Amino acid sequence: GLLYDYAMLAEKANKMDVMETALRKIIRLAPDNQHAYNALGYSFADRNIHLQEALALIEKASKIAPEDPFIMDSMGWVQFRLGRLQEAENYLRRAYAIRPDVEIGVHLGEVLWVKGQRAEAQQFWRDANQKDPQSDLLKSTLTRLRAQL
C-alpha cells in the first residue's frame, strides 16, 4: 500500500527513522503484513543493529509466508549478522534455489567468502554480475571484502 511505498522511499532517501515509524505503523494496523515485518527486520540486520528484534520480526514474516525467498534472504542475513554462518548459508541457499536473485546471490557469496569458500563465493558474484553489471550491492560488497570476481 501507500504507507509501505512511503517507507521504502524513506529508506532510499536514507531517512531510516521515517521508514521505521511507517513500518511500525503498518505492523500495528495490519499485523499479518509480512512485507512490513521483513522490511523492518532486514533494515536492522543490514545496518547490523537491533539484531534480536530483527530476528523476531523476520521470524514473524516467515510464519506468515514461509516460502517467500526474500524473507529467507532476510533470515539468512540476520543469521549471518549474528555469527551463525551455517544457518545463514542454509537459508540463503534455499532462497537462491527458489529465486536466483542478484541480492540473494551477493549475500550468499559473502557468507561463503567469510566461511573460506572463496571460489564458490566468486561464482555467485560472477552470476550476479552477469544479471546486473551495475549492482551497487555487488560493487560495495566486493570493495568491502577486498574481493574480485
Name each region found by the language model:
Residues 29, 63-64, 97-98, 131:
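Structural marker of alpha-solenoid helical repeat scaffolds
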Residues 49, 102, 107, 113-114, ...:
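Terminal, low-structured helical/coil segments at or just beyond the last alpha-helical repeat
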Residues 12-25, 47-60, 82-94, 116-127:
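Structural signature of tandem alpha-helical TPR/SEL1-like repeats
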